[in-house]
């Protein structure tokens, strides 16, 4: 039973929550993906919380990790060009336009990516007038 951790077509929502604004959930999630990969043979039938059961978990775990690392690299490159708030990163992180129905979730996920870069020493955060601005 994979729950929301390993989904066949979409990625899990990995977000900074208001109750833990300094957390590093993306690092924790990527670490857990690596642990799953080491613990599973690759032949298991995966039962996700969303979508159909599937096999080939190693390829899926690799794709999930690579996708996040690709977005982190693109985000870092953009932060070298200009300062950004979490909401400024949506076009880099998400394939679809972020509408009002998912704005909060998207902001939390953007913050998770920004904090990951910050804690890895690949970005810095400055708070001005209550707004977190990131640069690399």
Protein language model regions, located:
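Metallo-beta-lactamase
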Residues: 1-72
């Amino acid at each position: 039973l994979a729950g929301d951790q390993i989904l066949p077509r979409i990625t899990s929502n990995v977000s900074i929550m208001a109750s833990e604004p300094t957390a590093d959930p993306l690092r924790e999630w990527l670490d857990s993906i690596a642990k799953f990969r080491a613990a599973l043979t690759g032949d298991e039938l995966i039962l996700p919380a969303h979508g159909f059961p599937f096999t080939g978990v190693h390829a899926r775990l690799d794709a999930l990790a690579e996708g996040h690392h690709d977005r982190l690299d693109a985000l870092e490159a953009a932060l070298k060009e200009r300062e950004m708030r979490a909401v400024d990163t949506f076009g880099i992180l998400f394939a679809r336009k972020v509408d009002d129905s998912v704005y909060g979730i998207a902001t939390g996920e953007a913050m998770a990516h920004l904090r990951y870069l910050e804690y890895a020493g690949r970005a810095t955060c400055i708070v001005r007038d209550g707004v977190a601005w990131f640069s690399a």
